[in-house]
């Protein structure tokens, strides 16, 4: 099983950063939460901070986590370990991805997601519905 950490980076107005895989990557042009494979000598959190700096040129702080999501692709089994983060420095420079967007939470399901990310999107949406309901009337 390949262990991968990913970042749900939320900005100060509640928009979420999503990245589009390049045409040259596996799963070309699919959308995903940015991140990468966890190396043998690092934690999921260390991996995420390193990968986000390498891929997007920004620094992040991890503020929470979601449930790991296992997904079987035809050629590999992935365990995606998601973290909720905020950007603490740098300006986004795409080094591997084709595009990025800051989206309202309600618009996340409009994208063509990499399959492993779909469960993460769904859990994040449920979490946000519950928090908006509890802050209501």
Regions found by a protein language model. Give the residues of each.
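Short secondary-structure junctions
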Residues: 55-62
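A generic structural micro-feature
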Residues: 1, 30, 74-79, 94
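Active-site-adjacent beta-strand/loop module that shapes the phosphate/pyrophosphate-binding cleft
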Residues: 11, 59, 68-91, 99-101, ...
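Conserved Nudix-box catalytic region and its N-terminal flanking loop in Nudix hydrolases
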Residues: 15-54
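Nudix hydrolase/Nudix homology domain
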Residues: 93-137
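Conserved N-terminal beta-strand and adjoining loop/helix that marks the start
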Residues: 1-16, 37
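Hydrophobic packing within well-folded, soluble alpha/beta domains
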Residues: 44, 48-52, 65, 83, ...
């Amino acid at each position: 099983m390949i262990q991968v950490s990913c970042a749900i980076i939320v900005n100060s107005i509640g928009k979420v950063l999503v990245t589009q895989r390049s045409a040259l990557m596996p799963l070309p042009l699919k959308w995903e939460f940015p991140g990468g494979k966890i190396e043998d000598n690092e934690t999921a959190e260390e991996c995420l901070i390193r990968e986000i700096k390498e891929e997007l040129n920004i620094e992040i702080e991890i503020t929470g986590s979601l449930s790991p999501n296992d997904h079987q692709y035809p050629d590999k089994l992935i365990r995606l370990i998601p973290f909720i983060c905020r950007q603490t420095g740098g300006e986004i420079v795409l080094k591997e991805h084709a595009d990025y967007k800051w989206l309202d939470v309600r618009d996340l399901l409009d994208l063509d997601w990499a399959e492993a990310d779909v469960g993460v999107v769904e859990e994040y949406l449920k979490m946000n519905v519950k928090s908006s309901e509890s802050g209501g009337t």
